[in-house]
């Protein structure tokens, strides 16, 4: 679209007959029990985190903190930026996990309007990558995945107990625990 001489472009995704979509795989008979057990085991581990003020992303309206959230007794962690309004009061909370890919949080202020408009926002990454690391440090770590951007998606796929994404899903639950 062109508005006032400036061209804007964006993409959208739509589903054709989404009501006709059917699962490709069968849900395991113990699916709910498995996840309830995993979440209960995670709750046994104390909620442990550090929260460090990040001046460069704070403004006169919002505060930003870098959070390191420990997930489990294996000391696996995720990092995220926690933004919230400087004004007093209770605020709704927005939990923002990333899209696919191995990356750090590059532009934390791109969604600052959430906090400016009165929401607490926790944007986190799922791989344990400190967003304050240098590009060189990131390159060294990503080489561990043999340069395959999404190699983690099949890491441990042969076992639901060892599947990489199990930790990711539980990290999302832990993020909610942290925000509560």
Model-found features: residue ranges?
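Short beta-strand elements
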Residues: 5-33
């Amino acid at each position: 679209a062109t508005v006032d001489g400036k061209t804007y472009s964006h993409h959208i995704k739509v589903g054709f007959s989404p009501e006709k979509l059917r699962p490709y795989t069968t849900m395991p008979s113990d699916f709910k029990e498995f996840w309830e057990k995993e979440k209960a085991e995670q709750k046994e581990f104390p909620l442990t985190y550090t929260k460090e003020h990040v001046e460069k992303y704070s403004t006169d309206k919002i505060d930003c903190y870098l959070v390191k959230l420990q997930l489990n007794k294996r000391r696996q962690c995720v990092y995220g930026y926690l933004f919230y309004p400087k004004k007093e009061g209770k605020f709704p909370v927005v939990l923002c996990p990333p899209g696919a890919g191995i990356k750090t949080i590059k532009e934390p202020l791109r969604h600052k309007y959430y906090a400016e408009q009165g929401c607490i926002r926790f944007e986190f990454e799922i791989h344990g990558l400190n967003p304050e690391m240098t590009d060189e440090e990131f390159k060294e770590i990503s080489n561990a995945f043999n340069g395959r951007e999404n190699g983690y998606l099949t890491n441990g796929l042969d076992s639901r107990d060892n599947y990489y994404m199990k930790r990711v899903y539980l990290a999302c639950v832990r993020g909610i625990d942290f925000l509560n």
